[in-house]
Amino acid sequence: MSSQSLHDCLRGRCLGVLRRMEIIGRFRYYFQHPWSRLLVSYLVTFFNFLIFAEDPVSHSQKEAHMSVVGNCFSFIISKYPAGFWSVLKVLLWVLAIICGLIAGKFIFHRRLFGRVLRLKMFREDHGSWMTMFFSTILSLFIFSHIYNLLLLMSVRMRPYMVTEYMGIRNESFMKMAAVGTWMGDFVTAWMVTDMMLQDTHYPDWGRTARHLWRQGHNRIVLFWTVLICLTSVVVLVISTDWIRWDNLNRGFLPSDEVSRAFLASFILVFDLLIVMQDWEFPHFMGDLDMNLPGLSTTQLKIRLPVCKRIFKEEYHIHITGKWFNYGIIFLVLILDLNMWKNQIFYKPYEYGQYVGPGEKIYTVEDPDTLQDFNRSMLTWEWRSTNIDPRTNQTFNQSNAI
């Protein structure tokens, strides 16, 4: 009797394990199905355009600021003093880049990820360039503070201190970010499309499309044609304000801080889902090494000749398709995180804006006047009752909705 009970117990456990495996298998089948992956990748592109159009920060005339990345931008691009200090600044950020690359390659990638954590996705040299990129950002951030400490030696150098403020307006920065996210999202979506049409994990899906896609150079011609045409249109529309979303929308789907915060959160989740839906996630150990977008090769190899008397070898830059495309996703993720932060902690007065009747957000379009306004002056009550002496009209009449 006890033997029969033990047999039934083991049988029940085996059936339970098989049932769980069946559920997991079904979930993965639909979660990683080509239609699911295509839907997520193209929805990210659409949502990024939507949040750029709805985000009031994209109309702000105040100086753009961004944690960490803003310091790096200010350190390399803007706020250059004259004479010796300018040379010192260049030397420091060049040294920061070199230190960041070395630390990323040998400390973070090889020692931390490879030997200590033993992460399979970072085996050999896989993912080293992405690791080196993020370690370089960290290095630039640290060296920018070292540069600030040196500037404290002179009182006249205080205006040149490196901060998170980037020296450009939010309107200009958001346009550049929109173009950057478009490029990253499109290349990623096209990478997913390319992978779906090249692989055979789902042999019954899209047979006709796969047949046409694999003929000759169809995929390469289509990639560059669509990329150049759509990017030209996107850059034209974003940079010239030829199409204004507020004029098209006309309050049909008005948004507020909560809805924009949820939209930004969905974008972040979808960015991660694109990587998680990969058939080789999380180790990326499969034999399939997909072609780079717009190219007929799975990897880029660049030979760097060095002094053979010292190193006795040549160095090779090797970028595989997987890390090239998913590396782009993580770059876009930086901009999406900044967008998410703006929506979560949005305060109109910090961006030269205020709330008017009907919960509409008004933007002060003259950036020079923002220096003279404090928080109490950036309200509808004050701006609708005070006269601008330059125009002899109330301040709110010169502001954009």
UniProtKB/Swiss-Prot annotation:
UniProt record, GO biological process: intrinsic apoptotic signaling pathway in response to endoplasmic reticulum stress
Superkingdom per UniProt: Eukaryota
Keywords: Cell membrane, Glycoprotein, Membrane, Transmembrane, Transmembrane helix
InterPro entries, alphabetized: TMEM117 (IPR029370)
Residues bearing glycans: N170, N374, N392, N396
Cellular component per GO, a single term: plasma membrane
Cytoplasmic side: 1-37, 103-131, 198-219, 282-316
Transmembrane segments: 38-58, 82-102, 132-152, 177-197, 220-240, 261-281, 317-337
Parts of the chain on the Extracellular side: 59-81, 153-176, 241-260, 338-401
One Pfam family linked to the record: TMEM117
Predominant cellular place of this UniProt entry's protein: membrane
Family stated for the protein in its record: Belongs to the TMEM117 family.
PANTHER family named in the record: TRANSMEMBRANE PROTEIN 117 (PTHR31226:SF1)
Role, per record: May be involved in endoplasmic reticulum (ER) stress-induced cell death pathway.
Record's protein name: Transmembrane protein 117
Protein's organism: Danio rerio
Gene: tmem117
